[in-house]
């Protein structure tokens, strides 16, 4: 029998977190995208990861980001388009994090502009 006094339906039995940092790269119409994912147990760690990538790739046109922290029904989420058209970079990053049901992580994508405007679909 379950002790109802300690049961919290807002807390999952398990959560999905990154085992460690990861990165990837792609080129789209001469624009170069570098993606980084980091475990982030709190907002301070997430902000430090973003700042670290932005410092390292200071010559990139943009450093878009998103994070999802915490567990339960209302995790703390944040996204930043960093100068890309509103909703075209940070929100798709956050959607990818949600789709994979990850938490306590931050994703940063830097873009080196290749001279061709890509439009607003899925930057």
What are these language model-derived features?
Residues 1-87:
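C-terminal regulatory domains involved in ligand/effector binding and gene-expression control
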Residues 105-110, 115-123:
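Glycine- and Gly-Pro-enriched alpha-helical subdomains that act as flexible
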Residues 54, 97-102:
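Signal for well-folded cores of large energy- and translation-related assemblies
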Residues 86, 90-96, 123:
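Conserved mixed alpha/beta catalytic, RNA-binding, or beta-rich assembly cores of soluble enzyme
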Residues 72, 79, 103-104, 110:
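Hydrophobic alpha-helical segments and their boundary regions
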């Amino acid at each position: 029998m379950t002790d109802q006094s300690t049961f919290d339906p807002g807390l999952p039995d398990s959560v999905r977190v990154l085992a460690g940092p990861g990165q990837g790269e792609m080129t789209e119409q001469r624009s170069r995208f570098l993606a980084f994912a980091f475990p982030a147990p709190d907002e301070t760690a997430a902000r430090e990861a973003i700042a670290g990538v932005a410092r390292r790739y200071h010559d990139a046109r943009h450093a878009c980001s998103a994070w999802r922290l915490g567990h339960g029904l209302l995790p703390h989420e944040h996204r930043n388009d960093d100068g890309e058209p509103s909703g075209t970079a940070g929100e798709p990053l956050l959607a990818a994090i949600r789709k994979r049901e990850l938490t306590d992580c931050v994703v940063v994508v830097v873009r080196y502009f290749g001279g061709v405007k890509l439009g607003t679909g899925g930057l």
